[in-house]
Regions:
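Short active-site neighborhood of thiol/selenol oxidoreductases, capturing the structured segment around
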Residues: 75-103
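Second-shell loop/turn segments in exported
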Residues: 89-94, 122-127, 147-150, 238-244
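C-terminal lobe and adjacent flexible extensions of AdoMet/dcAdoMet transferase-like proteins
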Residues: 205-270
Length: 270
């Protein structure tokens, strides 16, 4: 069974939608038609996610993050660009590789539309204890991420503060038995991280404007062979038999089109 709205990275576990629901209850606005010229993309469907209009305060935007190259950055450093931010961990076996595959397809479409400098894709770990910059860099090479793709970590307290602000829950849990082997080191895993599957869209002024919660439909997405082999039974089911309520790369592009006021066509992988 795959997750839909409020879904988790480990789909066998209980969903925890309450935190994000509280955020959206405060921030949600009606998804009305765009008042621009004909052909200008309007807000995405309410079926996909929730339109919001919420500032990200300096206390969150300026928290220090570190890229896979070991360079300092922050959410505020990307102001001036539309930011697509996802939570993930490099050792996720069920949904994160699929989210990454969809984001790669979205990145290609954005670049083909001439919007590469206006849109930034970023993934911030929910497993800072293991996801060091060097490990994130290995993940970058594994998935073939473009140079402008942001893979981020931070001290645990910073990661927790950022995701708590956005209403994205996660928690460390025991590893299944028998334990899976780390795709990078080959060593047996000793724990896992349950987490929500969140896709957050920030506009060029740094305001949170749209939220998608749920597992991805990565049919046709470029999932790295090593990560495909790393998927567990639930992950393979998510990849090969996605639930009807999951989001596709084309779905993920609609908030970007709305925020950039540009039509964007999906570019197939390969």
């Amino acid at each position: 069974m795959t997750a839909s709205v409020g879904g988790t990275g480990r789909l066998s576990r209980a969903r925890r939608p309450g935190a994000l629901a509280a955020v959206l209850a405060v921030a949600a606005v009606a998804a009305t038609a765009c008042g621009g010229s004909p052909g200008t993309p309007g807000p995405p469907s309410a079926y996909l996610g929730t339109v919001v209009d919420r500032p990200v305060p300096a206390g969150i935007a300026d928290l220090p993050l570190t890229t896979d190259a070991g360079q300092p950055t922050s959410l505020g450093a990307w102001r001036g660009q539309v930011v697509v931010l996802a939570d993930f961990l490099t050792l996720c076996q069920e949904t994160c590789p699929l989210t990454t595959g969809n984001l790669l397809m979205m990145d290609r479409a954005v670049s083909a539309a001439g919007l590469g400098r206006r849109v930034r894709f970023a993934e911030l770990t929910v497993d800072p204890g293991r996801d060091t910059p060097s490990r994130l860099h290995a993940y970058r090479k594994l998935i073939g991420a473009p140079a402008n793709w942001l893979l981020l970590t931070a001290p645990p307290a910073v990661v927790e503060r950022i995701w708590r602000y956005f209403g994205v829950w996660y928690q460390r849990v025991g590893e299944d038995r028998p334990p899976a082997a780390d795709w990078l080191t080959g060593r047996a895993l000793t724990y896992d991280v349950d987490h929500a599957d969140a896709l957050l869209y920030l506009d060029a002024s740094g305001r949170l404007r749209f939220v998608v919660m749920g597992a991805p439909n990565a049919s046709g997405a470029p999932v790295a062979p090593a990560l495909r082999r790393f998927l567990d039974a639930k992950g393979l089911a998510n990849l090969n038999h996605p639930d009807a309520s999951t989001w596709t790369a084309a779905d993920g592009l609609s908030p970007i089109a709305w925020l950039t006021k540009r039509q964007i066509r999906t570019v197939t992988s390969g």
